[in-house]
């Protein structure tokens, strides 16, 4: 039996949006970014990319049209994990790496909540790597914002699981010998149903990705390239620089050919490796260029595209939604199993408890 | 041929065989028969951690001990009166526990050269039965070809020889059921249901069971059968229940009586997994179970569910608690209701997964960074796991705190008759969720304070998402008193550390006085314990009293906080004995808290304490306290018919 069959059997509609069961604002009522701003002073370093993301999220949340009290932000430990304190929603700043597990319990216990996880490259990929891949595998309805600055900021500058090999940091004075993770490749390998990448400095793109992630039912993983001006300044410079970004960003748009550098370069299949590569469009022709299909149920091509991300200095990276497929969510199915059992029970809970305790081989002493 | 029937007041039987021989099932069936018959009973399953250790070897031996009586008993018994050994390894592994004169029934079929050598026997001990000084010289041995007779009894069903021989445990059960006058219908009913889909296996097992019974009745090898009358028990309806099942039922009941959905986040671990299995069956009570990717995720999900307004529960054993410690600290800091169940096993590290121990008390008390107090509740018997789970839930919800429920392998897998409670007798638990702050006359609403406290309990509000006006942020960083925002203020931290401790201490206001069993009122020695040692301590105390001496007994269900009157009670005795299956963890706490000279009785064999050894230790202390020599054996009243619960 396929997963889809299971959801049909449990009486779930085939498609739901991520926020469908979350109470909306009353008709005619609107919110602004200010409604989502808490009274707490924001304490990131001047110039930190986190400010831009916070502003974008505060600006975007009113667009969801949801009741503020039904939104919960859960974070782990790290600079970005202070995020929930600055939003006037429900929130929990939890422990290192465990936010996805806490959010899993929260999202499974309550269908009426919009659940967000804020995490960093150390939090999500190092200490919390296990929880991340299992959240993605289960496909719990939540959105994970993974702030990737490729460094440990809060502990003052050690290399992270996304730092490039050879990086000289406080804990690697002669260069890191660790092979970095590519978070998008990792998420696709875990068969995540929604995987995207965006950049802190491009508010428009960031907002559009957040919007798609929130609308997706299941675990949405959004990697956000985020600059740390203190310990890893300029890590994403090529993706941001006026003169370099066109050559560095490979924009992914569903249904469009994957071209960049003003249309001069395109992504084509590479028969030699079975993967994909960058080619001059002039040489291969536009017809040979891959048309991006984010809805492909097979993650193979999305994975191949994710490999175009430079592993060392980030001079090239695909940006956009790599994958977005419908798959039954863990929380919907767990609740459906429980509610089917609850609905099938006729007697009162006390009566049924009495029957449960008194079942099996019993004897009576008078 | 009519056989003699002899009256006994109690019997301890141990079934032992290879891990694959079905000894747990055999013991369990005998127990159910005895329970329905109306005997009081206690059981002690004992099995290796390996699912199938090498066949025929001593490490592969699995056993099940059942103690049943015509009166109230407290333990599974120190030493078996009867050993059923299905192979040489089972005989060798258990013979040392038998008192002189014990009955031994062996499956002679399995005493082959190969099996004897696997068990480490140079010569077949069955060949020297009756010889003084031989291996089996001191026992009443009955070699019976259980396998051969089983194969013969089931041949009409056309099973392979291997399948046919597998029914030998039912043959043995039938024989023992005859010997002790057990009712047969429950087992036939059980087999009919269990093997409903495989008629030939079903019929073969029933045939083997009946053949065993008939063999007992007709053979001249067994001249006597025994009768153990039902035990007087308080009126009510009873069932036999294991601790893990009772604990799972207690959690279901806590959900029903609090009107909260139960959410279990758990990772499989011996000996706690049964609770996960059981709770996963009870979705109709609104119970959600999540088998997490690891121990940490299990408790993480439970904390998330608790924040969402469910009764968050996580179940594990010692190694799992070690992994969950940081998350327990988070629940302490965020002051959320949470049940943490630790079914203790032998440690440290992986230790003895299938054996019992109570060496996690100090881990429960102190096993976290910082000042991180949690409430601790410990059940004292299998059936008591039900009430203890309800009590733990009451504390967690009322005081918004993690509660550690300390069960252990002995009561988790052991069973006893349990009077099924009336649902209306069970306590109710009020979640008391915070509601939206009232709008003032000027139209403004007061700022919600997530760390404001109830003056009586010092609990903070349980403010769940979805409640307008209560938006707030919690987390692991220190919280400012009242408003709950991050605070690095030194005075605030000192205050919050003390408040979190004071809240746990406040729980003592809600506890009943500690019951002290001191019938004469003249005892100078108090024996105090906690958890599963209740039975062995009670049995040891009985023996000392039987010998004419005074001794008092008290048992702690609440380990943190202690009952308010504990200090005063301890001060009232000259000597305090603290028996524990650890190196003196409660002793340490009592000494530190009350400055009393608590003396430990500490045995860590992975098995329940033996009542006889305990009785000797109590007697010694009574002798010291009263300045008289105490010899238990000489002082026992020979006319007494009351059980002493010790080895003969």
Give the role of each language-model region.
Chain A
Residues 40, 67-71, 99, 110-115, ...:
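Short coil/turn connectors at secondary-structure junctions
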Residues 193-249:
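ATP/pyrophosphate-binding catalytic subdomain of soluble kinases
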Residues 112, 160-213:
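Conserved thiamine diphosphate
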Residues 26, 30, 34-95:
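Active-site diphosphate/adenylate-binding microenvironment
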Residues 77-79, 149-151, 202, 225-230, ...:
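Glycine-rich beta-alpha junction loops
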Residues 129-136, 154-167, 186:
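Active-site-proximal loop->helix
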Residues 77-153, 207:
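Thiamine diphosphate
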Residues 2-30, 39, 230-366:
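Flexible, low-complexity linker and terminal segments
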């Amino acid at each position: 039996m396929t997963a889809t069959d299971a959801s049909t059997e449990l009486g779930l509609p085939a498609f739901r949006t991520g926020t469908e069961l979350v109470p909306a604002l009353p008709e005619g009522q609107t919110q602004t970014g200010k409604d989502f701003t808490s009274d707490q002073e924001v304490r990131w370093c001047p110039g930190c990319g986190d400010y831009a993301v916070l502003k974008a999220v505060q600006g975007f949340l009113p667009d969801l049209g949801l009741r503020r009290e039904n939104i919960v932000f859960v974070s782990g430990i790290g600079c970005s994990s202070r995020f929930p304190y600055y939003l006037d929603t429900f929130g929990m700043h939890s422990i290192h790496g465990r936010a996805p597990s806490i959010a899993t319990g929260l999202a499974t216990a309550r269908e009426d909540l919009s659940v967000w996880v804020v995490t960093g490259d150390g939090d999500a990929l190092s200490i919390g790597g296990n929880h991340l891949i299992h959240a993605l595998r289960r496909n719990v309805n939540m959105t994970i914002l993974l702030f990737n600055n490729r460094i440990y900021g809060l502990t003052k500058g050690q290399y992270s699981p996304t730092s490039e090999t050879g990086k000289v940091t406080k804990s690697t004075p002669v260069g890191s010998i660790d092979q970095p993770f590519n978070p998008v490749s990792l998420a696709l390998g875990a068969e995540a149903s929604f995987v995207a990448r965006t950049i802190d400095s491009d508010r428009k793109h960031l907002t559009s990705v957040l919007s798609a992630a929130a609308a997706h039912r299941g675990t949405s993983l959004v990697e956000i390239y985020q600059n740390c001006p203190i310990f890893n300044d300029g890590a994403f410079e090529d993706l941001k620089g006026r003169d370099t970004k066109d050559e560095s960003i490979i924009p992914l748009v569903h249904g469009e050919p994957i071209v960049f550098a003003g249309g001069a370069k395109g992504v084509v299949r590479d028969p030699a490796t079975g993967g994909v590569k960058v080619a001059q469009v002039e040489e291969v022709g536009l017809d040979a260029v891959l048309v991006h299909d984010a809805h492909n149920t097979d993650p193979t091509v999305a994975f191949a595209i994710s490999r175009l991300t430079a592993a060392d200095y980030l001079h090239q990276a695909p940006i956009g939604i790599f994958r977005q497929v419908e798959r039954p969510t863990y929380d919907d199915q767990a609740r459906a199993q429980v509610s089917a059992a609850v609905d099938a029970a006729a007697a009162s809970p006390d009566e049924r408890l009495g029957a449960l305790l008194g079942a099996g081989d019993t004897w009576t002493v008078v | 041929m009519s056989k003699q029937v002899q009256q006994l007041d109690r019997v301890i039987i141990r079934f032992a065989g290879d891990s694959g021989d079905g000894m747990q099932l055999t013991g369990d069936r005998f127990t159910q028969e005895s329970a329905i018959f109306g005997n009081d009973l206690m059981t002690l399953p004992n099995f290796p951690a390996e699912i199938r250790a090498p066949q025929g070897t001593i490490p592969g031996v699995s056993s099940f001990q059942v103690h049943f009586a015509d009166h109230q008993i407290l333990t599974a018994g120190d030493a078996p009166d009867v050993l059923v050994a299905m192979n040489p390894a089972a005989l060798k592994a258990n013979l040392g526990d038998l008192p002189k004169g014990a009955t031994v029934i062996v499956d002679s079929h399995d005493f082959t050269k190969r099996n004897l050598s696997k068990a480490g026997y140079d010569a077949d001990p069955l060949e020297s039965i009756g010889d003084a000084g031989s291996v089996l010289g001191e026992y009443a041995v009955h070699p019976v070809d259980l396998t051969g007779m089983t194969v013969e009894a089931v041949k009409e069903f056309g099973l392979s020889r291997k399948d046919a021989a597998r029914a030998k445990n039912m043959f043995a059960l039938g024989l023992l059921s005859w010997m002790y006058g057990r009712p047969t219908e429950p087992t036939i009913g059980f087999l009919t249901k269990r093997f409903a889909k495989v008629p030939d296996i079903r019929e073969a097992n029933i045939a083997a069971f009946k053949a065993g019974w008939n063999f007992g009745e007709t053979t001249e090898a067994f001249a006597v059968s025994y009768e153990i009358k039902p035990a007087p028990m308080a009126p009510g309806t009873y069932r036999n229940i294991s601790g893990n099942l009772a604990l799972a039922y207690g959690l279901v009941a806590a959900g029903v009586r609090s009107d909260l959905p139960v959410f279990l986040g758990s990772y499989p671990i011996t000996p706690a997994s049964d609770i996960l299995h059981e709770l996963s069956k009870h979705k109709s009570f609104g119970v959600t179970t999540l088998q997490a990717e690891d121990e940490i995720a299990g408790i993480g999900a439970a904390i998330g569910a608790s924040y969402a307004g469910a009764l968050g529960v996580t179940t594990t054993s010692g190694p799992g608690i070690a992994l969950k410690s940081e998350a327990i600290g988070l629940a302490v800091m965020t002051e959320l209701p949470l049940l943490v169940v630790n079914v203790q096993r032998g440690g440290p590290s992986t230790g003895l997964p299938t054996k019992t121990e109570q060496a996690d008390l100090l881990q429960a008390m102190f096993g976290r960074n910082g000042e991180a107090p949690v409430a601790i509740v410990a059940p004292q018997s299998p059936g008591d796991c039900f009430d203890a789970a309800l009590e733990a839930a009451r504390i967690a919800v009322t005081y918004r705190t993690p509660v550690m429920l300390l069960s252990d392998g002995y009561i988790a897998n052991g069973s006893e008759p349990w009077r099924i409670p009336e649902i209306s007798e069970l306590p109710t638990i009020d979640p008391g969720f915070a509601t939206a702050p009232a709008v003032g006359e000027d139209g403004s609403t007061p700022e919600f304070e997530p760390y404001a406290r109830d003056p009586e309990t010092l609990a903070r509000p349980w403010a769940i998402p979805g409640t307008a006006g209560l938006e707030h942020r919690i987390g692991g960083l220190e919280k400012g008193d009242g408003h709950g925002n991050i605070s690095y203020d030194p005075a605030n931290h000192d205050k919050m550390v003390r408040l979190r401790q004071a809240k746990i201490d406040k729980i003592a206001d809600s506890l009943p006085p500690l019951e002290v069993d001191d019938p004469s009122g003249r005892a100078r020695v108090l024996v105090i314990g906690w958890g599963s040692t209740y039975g062995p301590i009670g049995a040891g105390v009985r023996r000392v009293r039987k010998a004419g001496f005074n001794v008092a007994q008290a048992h702690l269900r609440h380990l943190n906080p202690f009952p308010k009157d504990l200090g005063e009670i301890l001060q009232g005795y000259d000597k305090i004995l603290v028996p524990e299956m650890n190196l003196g963890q409660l002793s340490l706490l009592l000494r530190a808290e009350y400055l009393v000279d608590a003396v430990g009785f500490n045995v860590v064999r992975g098995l329940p304490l033996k009542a006889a050894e305990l009785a000797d230790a109590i007697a010694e202390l009574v002798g010291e306290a009263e300045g008289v020599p105490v010899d238990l054996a000489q002082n026992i009243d020979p006319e007494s018919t009351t059980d002493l619960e010790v080895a003969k």
